[in-house]
Design a protein with these regions (language model features):
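Local sequence-structure signature of Cys/Sec-based thiol-disulfide redox active-site neighborhoods
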Residues: 1-19, 23, 28-32
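Alpha-helix C-terminal capping segments
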Residues: 20, 115-116
């Protein structure tokens, strides 16, 4: 079963939901603001998506700007980054699509779905 991790008020996440439905792809929805990702889940997402840890940040989010993470994240350890991301779902890049054997984050999700 596929899992879409997103935020219900996010227009990009809504568009991905529509795309999944148009392609008749079944999925479970996980609200990132209510059901936070654990450190282990974040590590797995990073590894399976084959992305840099900094790509897990929602750099356009309000919380990201409020915390001044553009400059601060460079001085953080990997563990500090994972701890921070696991404490606030609004800091995590979305949407995230978990398939049987792959993970797609942010713009990768749309590219993947359009390729099907």
């Amino acid at each position: 079963m596929n899992t879409l991790i997103g935020y219900k008020k996010c227009s990009t996440c809504k568009n991905i939901e529509k795309l999944l439905e148009e392609k008749n792809i079944s999925y479970d929805y996980r609200e990132i603001d209510k059901d936070l990702l654990s450190v282990d889940e974040l590590k797995k997402i990073k590894d399976l998506a084959e992305i840099d840890i900094f790509k897990l940040f929602n750099t356009s989010g309000i919380r990201y700007r409020e915390l001044g993470l553009k400059d601060k994240k460079k001085d953080m350890t990997e563990e500090e980054i994972y701890d921070l991301l696991s404490s606030d779902g609004m800091l995590v890049k979305r949407p995230i699509l978990l398939t049987k054997d792959k993970v797609f984050v942010g713009p990768q999700v749309k590219k993947y779905l359009e390729s099907l």
